[in-house]
Swiss-Prot record:
InterPro entries: P-loop_NTPase, RapZ-like, RapZ-like_N, RapZ_C. Belongs to the RapZ-like family. Disulfide bonds: none annotated. It holds the Pfam family PapZ_C. This is Nucleotide-binding protein OB2468. GO terms for molecular function: ATP binding; GTP binding. It comes from Oceanobacillus iheyensis (strain DSM 14371 / CIP 107618 / JCM 11309 / KCTC 3954 / HTE831). GTP binds at D65, L66, R67, G68. Displays ATPase and GTPase activities. HAMAP family: RapZ_like. ATP binds at G14, M15, S16, G17, A18, G19, K20, T21. Keywords: ATP-binding, GTP-binding, Nucleotide-binding.
Length: 293
């Protein structure tokens, strides 16, 4: 590979039960194209596809989950090829944990270790640790997850691998009409049907909350301003808590009767207000439904 290749590669490997599933989910939140359990023999071919400029894939994370020595041999062959092509400057992440912690995790999940004989996880763990010892030595980064909860592991990965100024947590405001049902993906729902309805103002009825005349009408009422102040205070308090708990996205739904006027104007407003501290998005689920009814 030439030096102009911009694709960033992270290979996630390590002990079974050490947190590879949490790790790959964390890389997904960072915008990586993720593949779980790619056979090592397919790794060079897969990366050849990544070289195709039309893919426009700049960040790739792969979980290499070894299930036997035959995979181990083919993985090292693949790593040797990648090293010659300058893929692996700082891209092998090895997740580890003490035997006692791994045994406890397998007991809690009631799953068997992939290399265990007679269902005894410790036997499989010892065998896997022996197989992976050399690979562990080649890793550029090792994370011991013994004392880490899934949330802590995610935070650690985000801290290490996120790009400068990259914001992982985002807030999506969506307007909707109650007559069409609640958004199924909403985390928080606010009902603004108590506010004066532009639908009953003849010159505003055919417009939407995206129109300045409609938004001015919605915002001119004291109840609207009180609602905005209280919701802004609530979100200012809650968003850092959701972020701290490890959520990558919060969906805030704002509903009025038909999803045309009040909810649209307010969703736009909150998206702009909160954009000072967060990555925000706004969409209007039902804004076009009146046209087809």
């Amino acid at each position: 590979m030439n030096q102009e290749q911009e694709t960033k590669l992270v290979i996630i490997t390590g002990m079974s039960g050490a947190g590879k599933t949490v790790a790959i989910q964390s890389f997904e939140d960072l915008g990586y194209y993720c593949v779980d359990n790619l056979p090592p023999a397919l790794l060079p071919k897969f990366l050849d596809l990544m070289k195709d400029a039309t893919n426009n894939i700049q960040k790739v994370a792969l979980v290499m989950d070894l299930r036997g020595r035959e995979f181990f041999d083919s993985l090292f062959e693949a790593l040797d090829v990648l090293a010659k092509e300058n893929w692996l400057e700082d891209h092998i992440l090895f997740l580890d944990a003490k035997d006692e912690a791994l045994v406890t995790r397998y007991k809690e999940t009631r799953r068997s270790h992939p290399l265990a004989t007679d269902g005894l996880p410790l036997d499989g763990i010892k065998q896997e640790r022996e197989i992976l010892d050399e690979l562990r030595g080649r890793a550029q980064r090792i994370i011991d997850t013994t004392s880490l909860k899934p949330r802590n592991l995610r935070e650690k990965i985000l801290k290490v691998y996120k790009e400068e100024k990259q914001e992982v947590f985002s807030v999506h405001f969506v307007s909707f009409g109650f007559k069409y049902g609640l958004p199924i993906d909403a985390d928080l729902v606010f009902d603004v049907r108590f506010l004066p309805n532009p639908h009953y103002v003849s010159n505003l009825q055919p417009l939407t909350g995206l129109n300045p005349d409609v938004s001015s009408y919605v915002f001119k009422w004291s109840d609207t301003q009180t609602f905005i102040d209280k919701v802004t205070d609530l979100l200012t308090f809650m968003l850092p808590q959701y972020k701290k708990e490890g959520k990558s996205q919060l969906v805030v739904a704002i509903g009025c009767t038909g999803g045309q006027h009040r909810s649209v104007a307010l969703a736009e407003h909150f998206s702009k207000v909160l954009s000072n501290g967060y990555t925000t998005h706004v969409s209007h689920r039902d804004i076009d439904k009146r046209k087809v009814l």
